[in-house]
């Protein structure tokens, strides 16, 4: 979290050091698949602005991976530095930049309906496994490409819309079972095989879609 704030602070310093940028400042609160966020931008010309922002949200989901039920605590936290190019000096814009990506899934395993887990073809009771936890994380530096509408330099106020994608790389999965009664080496080996297979199943999740809707005010 502190790293995300550091990116925003450094980005603000860079944006406001751009010659002529102080004359046109935009504030853009928004909500979308990156969470609740805000961007502060400075117009460099009638077609270009530079912005920094921060996104944050927590969401809970449930699902099944490799036959194991999980509760997912999705933590969305990212800082961003963006360039917004308005090719026609109007509302339409092309958008590119980078995120300091702290997005992650915190996983808590739940036994199936029979009260058991199945790891790598071996069945364990809930008592044998104990507490099953994990984390799904991504590249910390993630480029962004997209297009959007609104928040043009020298504008006044209005609605913004963004559609794009973040390249976050292959997900990295960790799993750990603690406090159980199963023989540690055997459980650890099967849990590692389960982790590798689940990570492979998730390997195509390299791009994170971005849809955002917000308001902008420029002064």
Per-range role (PLM):
Residues 27-33, 52-56, 94-102, 161-167:
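Transmembrane beta-barrel strands of outer-membrane/channel proteins
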Residues 54-81, 103-141, 169-210:
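Extracellular/periplasm-exposed beta-strand and loop segments of Gram-negative cell-envelope proteins
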Residues 31, 42, 85-87, 98, ...:
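Residue-level signature of outer-membrane beta-barrel architecture
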Residues 23, 44-50, 88-90, 153-155:
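Short coil turns and loop connectors of transmembrane beta-barrels in diderm outer membranes
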Residues 25, 36-38, 48, 77-81, ...:
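Hydrophobic, lipid-facing positions within transmembrane beta-strands of outer-membrane proteins
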Residues 84-88, 93, 157, 205-219:
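Outer-membrane beta-barrel "beta-signal"
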Residues 17-18:
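N-terminal signal peptide c-region/cleavage motif recognized by signal peptidases
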Residues 1-9:
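Bacterial N-terminal signal peptides that target proteins for export
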């Amino acid at each position: 979290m502190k790293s995300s704030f550091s990116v925003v602070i450094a980005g603000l310093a860079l944006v406001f050091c751009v010659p002529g940028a102080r004359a046109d400042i935009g504030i853009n609160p928004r909500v979308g698949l990156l969470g609740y966020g805000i961007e502060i931008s400075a117009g460099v010309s009638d077609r270009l602005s530079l912005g920094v922002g921060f996104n944050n949200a927590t969401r809970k989901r449930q699902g099944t991976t490799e036959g194991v039920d999980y509760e997912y605590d999705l933590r969305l936290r990212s800082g961003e530095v963006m360039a917004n190019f308005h090719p026609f000096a109007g509302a339409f814009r092309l958008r590119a930049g980078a995120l300091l990506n702290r997005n992650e899934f915190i996983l808590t395993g739940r036994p199936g309906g029979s009260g058991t887990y199945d790891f790598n073809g071996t069945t364990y009771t809930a008592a044998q496994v104990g507490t099953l936890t994990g984390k799904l994380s991504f590249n910390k530096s993630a480029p962004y490409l997209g297009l959007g509408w609104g928040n043009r330099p020298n504008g006044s106020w209005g609605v913004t819309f963004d559609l794009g994608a973040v390249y976050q790389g292959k997900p990295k999965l960790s799993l750990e079972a603690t406090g159980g009664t199963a023989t540690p080496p055997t459980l650890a080996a099967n849990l590692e095989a389960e982790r590798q297979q689940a990570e492979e199943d998730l390997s195509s999740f390299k791009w994170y879609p971005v849809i955002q809707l917000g308001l902008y005010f420029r002064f």
